Amino acid sequence: MKALSRSLKDLSMEPLPSRFEKALTLIDAVHREDPQVEVVEGIARPSEALYAERMSAWVERLQPDASELLRLAVRCQHLRRWAIPRDRYPTGRLGYHQWRTAQARAHAQAAGVLLRQAGYDEASIARVQALIRKERLRQDPETQCLEDAACLVYLEYGLPGFAAQHDEAQVIDILQKTWNKMSPRAREEALRLKLTPHARALLDKALAGT
């Protein structure tokens, strides 16, 4: 009986998870629902779970003192992305931008639901949602940090596969647009990336034309 009392006492003294920890748990659980998988070192992982981890890692590197709300926005960047497939929208640039806009709104709405469950106030939720929608890019340092992380994740992990599926001119065009969205600090990091020889050659060509 005394042992049980001690164990219950110890349990009651354990710190409760913070609202930030609760939010991350909820967010990551949603990411694990992604039906698309990526194999890394022989292990199949949900693609969006991997993306979220990579985004968080880059923000930690770019801005070690990043605010709690920026960290949450970064983690929510592709929340339930698979629920709105690209083929719902017309082909071409206009359809692509319509899809991206719909995605950003959906990610922000889904994030709001989870953050309320975790105990965040409406002002904090609104700030996270604005970051997810990338509002005031270039004017807002936190929005720029999120965008930098997204660009670096693309260059480090997405570029080789994209380059294999598209013609060189299209890839170079995308790389130039990506580069134009990045801050000077992010560009420095990009130049230090260990890219495949083909990806590096494409990036060099893109930068030569900027």
Report each predicted region and the residues it spans.
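Histidine/acidic-rich helix-loop-helix segments that form or flank divalent-metal centers
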Residues: 74, 121-152, 156-159, 163-166
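Divalent-cation-assisted or electrostatically stabilized phosphate/pyrophosphate-binding catalytic cores
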Residues: 89-110, 166-192, 199
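His-Asp-centered metal-binding catalytic motifs of divalent-metal-dependent phosphohydrolases/nucleases
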Residues: 68-87, 91, 107, 111, ...
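Alpha-helical phosphate/pyrophosphate-handling elements in metalloenzyme active cores
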Residues: 42-70, 111-118, 123-126
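N-terminal amphipathic/basic-hydrophobic helices that include classical n-h-c signal peptides
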Residues: 1-12
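Active-site flanking loop/helix segments enriched in acidic
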Residues: 19-56, 89-98, 102
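Long hydrophobic alpha-helical segments typical of transmembrane helices together
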Residues: 193-210
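Short coil/turn segments at secondary-structure boundaries
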Residues: 39, 85-88, 144-146, 190-191
